[in-house]
Design a protein with these regions (language model features):
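Aromatic "clamp/platform" in nucleotide-sugar-dependent glycosyltransferases that forms part
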Residues: 299
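Acceptor-binding helix/loop patch of EC 2.4 sugar-transfer enzymes
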Residues: 90, 153-185, 252, 329-331
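A charged, aromatic-enriched C-terminal amphipathic alpha-helix characteristic of glycosyltransferases
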Residues: 60, 356-389
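Conserved donor-binding/catalytic core segment of Leloir-type glycosyltransferases
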Residues: 51-52, 220-221, 226-253, 259
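Donor nucleotide-sugar binding/catalytic pocket of nucleotide-sugar-dependent glycosyltransferases
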Residues: 174-232
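Conserved donor-binding/catalytic loop of nucleotide-activated donor transferases
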Residues: 289-291, 309-316
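Short hydrophobic beta-strand element within catalytic cores of glycosyltransferases
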Residues: 316-325
Length: 393
């Protein structure tokens, strides 16, 4: 793969959306190389209406949601995602090489024809569906709707999380850190929210904290394959509980705050601690099935796929949850969120208390597994999409 020099890399990192279109294309072509062979068109069931979900498949969610909808209805579903070098290799129906997505006009036009023949398209994270075929995703949505396609929106997180509002939700917000570069994030999130409101149509969010920024949205919970994460084997017996933390982006998870406190506990013989990095998604079930406690995130004030996977694997999950998220979950599901909520700087005392209560520890494990089965197995998510968009009552 060709590589940009330092100046080019920094330009892309600070936000290519601010650059002229011709310069964005030039830099990306240098970075990504030439487009390869155009992938073949997907094969779908012509007897069924088709739902297409794309183009990011964060944490494999597009794939899982599509399968859940297909299992719960008469619809066929297809997910696709842009293949990012160095990614986590999540399951997806179609993976598009990033160079093809960015530079292949043949693929872009082919994908436009494919999606124009679908009945429903769920656009993820306000990311363009066809590379640079159109100037922006608003033009894409209008083109699809002109072809008779029913388009809805699914926001995942930073795409609509407004920094100036997030700092009011939690004092641990990454956007409250000295030196935080919030300008682009503020601009991008507000632009995306304004665009989806201008376009109108159903809006879904994958985590309940995002309802703050789009109160009109419906929560479509992240979902997992329960069988993949659950294990019939008992946890290994050990003198000290194994605490793991698997930050995809350490700065955004509060790793820098909690780790010094975890190292103190480890030196005191209270816990064994492992930081999980660069582990393929296929290996993560084994990691969580071997762990006792999983530390999620301490800056967003919410929870996501990591917490759900860990609860399914029989771990107690600790993270920072805002009151708004706790209320939203209980209002939507009728049950309390079984994550131990903890301020980042209190992780030491919270873990000591948690470990000392063996009976309560076991109850939390069982509550977490029940919660995942009821809310995050895909059935709840499929109902959200079907009842509020695909098959409204």
């Amino acid at each position: 793969m060709n590589k940009l020099g330092g100046i080019g890399r920094r330009l892309i990192q600070v936000g290519v959306d601010f650059l002229p279109a011709w310069l964005r294309r030039f830099l990306r072509r240098i970075q990504l190389g030439k487009a390869g062979q155009v992938p073949a068109l997907p094969t779908t069931d012509p007897q069924k209406q088709l739902l297409v979900i794309g183009p990011v498949n964060y944490a494999g969610q597009g794939y899982v949601w599509g399968n859940a909808v297909a299992a719960a209805s008469d619809l066929a579903a297809h997910s696709y995602a842009v293949e990012v070098p160095g990614g986590f290799s999540f399951a997806v129906d179609s993976e598009i090489p990033v160079a093809v997505y960015e530079t292949s006009r043949a693929w872009q036009k082919q994908q436009l024809r494919f999606l124009s023949g679908a009945d429903f398209v769920l656009l993820e994270a306000e990311v363009r569906l066809f590379g640079n075929l159109f100037q922006n995703f608003k033009q894409e949505v209008r083109a699809l709707r002109a072809a008779g396609v029913n388009v809805a929106f699914l926001a995942h997180g930073t795409d609509i999380r407004v920094p100036s509002q997030h700092v009011k939700q939690t004092r641990w917000s990454i956007h409250a850190e000295p030196g935080a570069d919030n300008f682009r994030a503020e601009w991008l999130s507000r632009r995306n929210i304004a665009a989806i409101r201008e376009l109108t149509g159903p809006v879904f969010v994958s985590t309940p904290d995002l309802l703050v920024y789009t109160p009109e949205a419906i929560w479509c919970p992240v979902a997992i394959d329960l069988q993949r994460w659950r294990s019939d084997s008992p946890k290994p017996k050990r003198e000290r509980p194994l605490v793991v933390h698997a930050p995809s982006r350490a700065a955004e998870k509060g790793t820098d705050i909690i780790e010094p406190l975890l190292f103190e506990l480890e030196r005191a013989g209270v816990i064994d601690y492992q930081r999980i990095q660069n582990v393929p998604s296929a290996k993560m079930p084994e990691v969580y099935q071997n762990a006792d406690i999983v530390l999620d995130q301490f800056r967003a004030g919410s929870y996501g796929v990591t917490a759900v996977e860990a609860m399914a694997a029989g771990c107690v999950v600790v993270g920072h949850i805002t009151p708004q998220v706790e209320r939203a979950v209980e209002e939507a599901t009728g049950v309390s969120l079984p994550i131990v909520s903890c301020e980042a700087n209190q992780i030491g005392s919270v873990l000591r208390e948690l470990i000392s209560d063996q009976a309560g520890f076991s109850e939390r494990i069982q509550a977490g597994q029940r919660f995942v089965k009821e809310v995050h197995s895909g059935e709840f998510s499929a109902r959200a999409l079907l009842q509020n968009w695909l098959r409204p009552q």
